[in-house]
Protein backbone atom coordinates (compact mmCIF):
# COMPACT_ATOMS: atom_id res chain seq x y z
CA UNK A 1 0.00 0.00 0.00
CA UNK A 2 2.83 2.37 0.77
CA UNK A 3 4.00 2.21 -2.87
CA UNK A 4 0.73 3.78 -4.04
CA UNK A 5 1.13 6.97 -2.00
CA UNK A 6 2.09 9.77 -4.40
CA UNK A 7 5.14 11.81 -3.52
CA UNK A 8 4.56 15.52 -3.97
CA UNK A 9 7.60 17.71 -4.55
CA UNK A 10 8.16 20.40 -1.94
CA UNK A 11 6.92 23.78 -3.07
CA UNK A 12 9.30 26.66 -3.38
CA UNK A 13 9.34 29.30 -0.69
CA UNK A 14 6.98 32.22 -1.21
CA UNK A 15 8.36 35.13 -3.18
CA UNK A 16 6.89 37.64 -0.73
CA UNK A 17 9.42 39.15 1.65
CA UNK A 18 9.31 37.75 5.21
CA UNK A 19 9.31 41.30 6.63
CA UNK A 20 5.76 41.96 5.42
CA UNK A 21 3.07 42.40 8.05
CA UNK A 22 0.63 39.97 6.44
CA UNK A 23 0.79 36.25 6.94
CA UNK A 24 1.65 34.14 3.90
CA UNK A 25 -1.72 32.35 4.16
CA UNK A 26 -3.73 35.56 3.77
CA UNK A 27 -5.81 36.10 0.61
CA UNK A 28 -3.50 38.90 -0.57
CA UNK A 29 -0.74 36.34 -1.22
CA UNK A 30 -2.79 34.13 -3.54
CA UNK A 31 -0.12 34.03 -6.20
CA UNK A 32 2.41 32.41 -3.87
CA UNK A 33 2.58 28.65 -3.60
CA UNK A 34 2.29 28.55 0.21
CA UNK A 35 -1.07 30.30 0.66
CA UNK A 36 -4.62 29.04 0.66
CA UNK A 37 -5.49 30.48 -2.72
CA UNK A 38 -6.24 29.00 -6.11
CA UNK A 39 -2.98 27.03 -6.03
CA UNK A 40 -4.32 24.63 -3.41
CA UNK A 41 -7.50 24.13 -5.40
CA UNK A 42 -5.40 23.35 -8.47
CA UNK A 43 -3.41 20.75 -6.53
CA UNK A 44 -6.59 19.10 -5.31
CA UNK A 45 -8.22 18.94 -8.74
CA UNK A 46 -5.03 17.78 -10.48
CA UNK A 47 -4.54 14.78 -8.23
CA UNK A 48 -8.09 13.40 -8.51
CA UNK A 49 -7.45 9.63 -8.49
CA UNK A 50 -4.22 9.78 -6.52
CA UNK A 51 -5.96 11.74 -3.79
CA UNK A 52 -8.52 8.99 -3.21
CA UNK A 53 -5.75 6.44 -2.89
CA UNK A 54 -3.75 8.60 -0.49
CA UNK A 55 -6.77 9.19 1.76
CA UNK A 56 -7.36 5.44 1.88
CA UNK A 57 -3.73 4.80 2.76
CA UNK A 58 -3.77 7.51 5.41
CA UNK A 59 -6.88 6.06 7.06
CA UNK A 60 -5.22 2.63 7.17
CA UNK A 61 -2.08 4.08 8.74
CA UNK A 62 -4.19 5.92 11.32
CA UNK A 63 -5.98 2.69 12.20
CA UNK A 64 -2.66 0.90 12.61
CA UNK A 65 -1.25 3.64 14.83
CA UNK A 66 -4.42 3.72 16.94
CA UNK A 67 -4.15 -0.05 17.49
CA UNK A 68 -0.61 0.40 18.78
CA UNK A 69 -1.50 3.23 21.14
CA UNK A 70 -4.70 1.71 22.56
CA UNK A 71 -3.07 0.93 25.89
CA UNK A 72 -3.80 2.23 29.38
CA UNK A 73 -2.56 5.71 28.38
CA UNK A 74 -6.05 7.26 28.41
CA UNK A 75 -7.23 8.44 31.82
CA UNK A 76 -10.85 8.12 32.85
CA UNK A 77 -12.63 11.47 32.98
CA UNK A 78 -12.88 12.43 36.64
CA UNK A 79 -16.27 14.04 37.41
CA UNK A 80 -16.05 17.61 38.63
CA UNK A 81 -17.18 18.00 42.27
CA UNK A 82 -19.29 21.12 41.63
CA UNK A 83 -21.31 19.64 38.76
CA UNK A 84 -24.39 17.51 39.32
CA UNK A 85 -24.01 14.39 37.14
CA UNK A 86 -27.80 13.90 37.11
CA UNK A 87 -28.57 17.44 35.84
CA UNK A 88 -30.79 17.55 32.77
CA UNK A 89 -31.36 20.86 31.01
CA UNK A 90 -35.00 21.95 30.97
CA UNK A 91 -35.05 22.29 27.16
CA UNK A 92 -36.24 18.84 26.03
CA UNK A 93 -34.87 18.02 22.61
CA UNK A 94 -33.19 21.33 21.95
CA UNK A 95 -32.05 22.49 18.53
CA UNK A 96 -31.31 18.91 17.44
CA UNK A 97 -34.99 17.97 17.64
CA UNK A 98 -35.99 21.08 15.70
CA UNK A 99 -37.47 22.85 18.72
CA UNK A 100 -36.53 26.33 19.84
CA UNK A 101 -34.35 26.31 22.94
CA UNK A 102 -36.22 27.27 26.08
CA UNK A 103 -35.09 30.42 27.79
CA UNK A 104 -34.53 30.83 31.49
CA UNK A 105 -37.16 32.84 33.38
CA UNK A 106 -36.15 36.24 34.64
CA UNK A 107 -36.72 37.42 38.21
CA UNK A 108 -39.96 39.24 37.43
CA UNK A 109 -41.50 36.10 35.92
CA UNK A 110 -40.37 33.95 38.85
CA UNK A 111 -41.87 36.38 41.39
CA UNK A 112 -45.14 36.57 39.45
CA UNK A 113 -45.38 32.77 39.36
CA UNK A 114 -44.59 32.66 43.09
CA UNK A 115 -47.40 35.11 43.86
CA UNK A 116 -49.86 33.01 41.87
CA UNK A 117 -49.22 29.90 44.00
CA UNK A 118 -51.82 29.01 46.66
CA UNK A 119 -49.95 30.09 49.82
CA UNK A 120 -51.29 29.31 53.30
CA UNK A 121 -51.04 31.76 56.20
CA UNK A 122 -48.58 29.59 58.12
CA UNK A 123 -46.23 29.02 55.14
CA UNK A 124 -42.81 30.59 55.68
CA UNK A 125 -41.89 33.58 53.55
CA UNK A 126 -39.12 36.17 53.51
CA UNK A 127 -40.90 38.42 56.01
CA UNK A 128 -41.85 35.75 58.56
CA UNK A 129 -38.33 34.40 59.05
CA UNK A 130 -36.90 35.51 62.38
CA UNK A 131 -33.17 36.13 62.34
CA UNK A 132 -30.92 37.38 65.11
CA UNK A 133 -29.42 40.84 64.75
CA UNK A 134 -26.20 41.14 62.83
CA UNK A 135 -22.85 40.98 64.61
CA UNK A 136 -21.58 43.82 62.45
CA UNK A 137 -22.23 47.27 63.88
CA UNK A 138 -24.79 49.25 61.91
CA UNK A 139 -23.42 51.99 59.67
CA UNK A 140 -24.25 55.50 60.80
CA UNK A 141 -25.20 58.10 58.23
CA UNK A 142 -25.37 61.88 58.44
CA UNK A 143 -28.81 63.31 59.22
CA UNK A 144 -28.20 66.25 56.89
CA UNK A 145 -26.36 64.88 53.83
CA UNK A 146 -26.81 61.10 54.05
CA UNK A 147 -23.06 60.46 53.84
CA UNK A 148 -21.27 58.11 56.23
CA UNK A 149 -21.11 59.96 59.55
CA UNK A 150 -18.20 59.49 61.89
CA UNK A 151 -19.28 62.20 64.32
CA UNK A 152 -22.28 63.04 66.52
CA UNK A 153 -23.12 66.49 67.85
CA UNK A 154 -23.26 66.13 71.67
CA UNK A 155 -25.75 68.99 72.00
CA UNK A 156 -28.40 68.03 69.44
CA UNK A 157 -27.47 64.32 68.98
CA UNK A 158 -27.52 64.79 65.20
CA UNK A 159 -24.93 62.92 63.13
CA UNK A 160 -22.66 64.74 60.69
CA UNK A 161 -19.73 63.92 58.42
CA UNK A 162 -17.93 67.23 57.72
CA UNK A 163 -17.10 70.50 59.46
CA UNK A 164 -19.53 72.40 57.23
CA UNK A 165 -22.38 70.13 58.33
CA UNK A 166 -21.44 70.66 61.98
CA UNK A 167 -21.63 74.44 61.61
CA UNK A 168 -24.98 74.05 59.80
CA UNK A 169 -26.34 71.78 62.57
CA UNK A 170 -25.30 74.26 65.29
CA UNK A 171 -27.32 77.04 63.59
CA UNK A 172 -30.51 74.93 63.25
CA UNK A 173 -33.55 75.81 65.39
CA UNK A 174 -34.73 73.21 67.90
CA UNK A 175 -37.90 72.25 65.99
CA UNK A 176 -35.84 71.38 62.87
CA UNK A 177 -33.46 69.34 65.05
CA UNK A 178 -36.39 67.37 66.49
CA UNK A 179 -37.70 66.89 62.94
CA UNK A 180 -34.36 65.34 61.87
CA UNK A 181 -34.35 63.12 64.96
CA UNK A 182 -37.90 61.90 64.34
CA UNK A 183 -36.98 61.08 60.74
CA UNK A 184 -34.22 58.88 62.12
CA UNK A 185 -36.63 57.53 64.77
CA UNK A 186 -34.36 58.71 67.55
CA UNK A 187 -35.81 60.11 70.75
CA UNK A 188 -35.33 63.80 71.25
CA UNK A 189 -33.38 64.70 74.40
CA UNK A 190 -34.21 68.39 74.20
CA UNK A 191 -37.75 69.05 75.57
Swiss-Prot record:
GO terms for biological process: chromatin remodeling; DNA recombination; DNA repair; positive regulation of DNA repair; positive regulation of DNA-templated transcription; positive regulation of telomere maintenance in response to DNA damage; regulation of cell cycle; regulation of chromosome organization. This is INO80 complex subunit C. Keywords: DNA damage, DNA recombination, DNA repair, Nucleus, Transcription, Transcription regulation. It comes from Rattus norvegicus. It is found in: Nucleus. SMART domains: YL1_C (SM00993). Residues 1-41 are annotated as: Disordered. PANTHER family: INO80 COMPLEX SUBUNIT C. GO terms for cellular component: cytosol; fibrillar center; Ino80 complex; MLL1 complex. Proposed core component of the chromatin remodeling INO80 complex which is involved in transcriptional regulation, DNA replication and probably DNA repair. Component of the chromatin remodeling INO80 complex; specifically part of a complex module associated with the helicase ATP-binding and the helicase C-terminal domain of INO80. Component of some MLL1/MLL complex, at least composed of the core components KMT2A/MLL1, ASH2L, HCFC1/HCF1, WDR5 and RBBP5, as well as the facultative components BACC1, CHD8, E2F6, HSP70, INO80C, KANSL1, LAS1L, MAX, MCRS1, MGA, MYST1/MOF, PELP1, PHF20, PRP31, RING2, RUVB1/TIP49A, RUVB2/TIP49B, SENP3, TAF1, TAF4, TAF6, TAF7, TAF9 and TEX10.
